[in-house]
Design a protein with these regions (language model features):
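Mature catalytic core of soluble alpha/beta enzymes
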Residues: 1-138
Length: 138
């Protein structure tokens, strides 16, 4: 999705980031976007398209380094960028490498990235410094 400027009444665009839970559609976070030049919001996740076999969940997201489905605890990655193609590519790439390497990569590349992962049965968030500095709702 790409938004530009603000709504007709002057208020920012509100975009929901979905809570990464299978079989449910709930909001994890609301972003309020009002960048004059426009911004794309792209999210990749492992929580919608998957199958389970032998007690293991296998995602439709494949790690290009192994050719196998990703199996780490990162569930969702959202990237904000002016270019929708780059935002989409980066959200998938960061999801492939997991939250630790993804966070390092997001920082080194100056990406506005939000990571949602599972830890001890709870959903946790982390974000790049560029995302936390972006003009969005917390």
């Amino acid at each position: 999705m790409r938004v530009r400027g603000s709504k007709a009444d002057g208020t920012p665009w509100r975009v929901a980031i979905e809570k990464p839970t299978p079989m449910a559609r709930e909001v994890q976070r609301i972003l309020e976007l009002h960048e004059a030049s426009g911004v794309a919001v792209m999210t990749s996740g492992t929580y919608r398209n998957f199958f389970e076999a032998g007690g293991q969940r296998y995602s439709h997201i494949l790690d290009p380094r192994t050719g196998r489905p990703v199996t780490h605890r990162l569930l969702s990655t959202t990237v904000l960028d002016e270019n929708p193609t780059l935002a989409d590519a980066w959200s998938t790439a960061l999801l492939c490498v997991g939250e630790v390497e993804g966070a390092r990569l997001a920082e080194s590349e100056g990406l506005k990235a939000l990571f949602i992962y599972g830890e001890d049965g709870q959903l946790r968030e982390s974000m790049s410094s560029h995302f936390s500095a972006a003009p969005v709702a917390r």
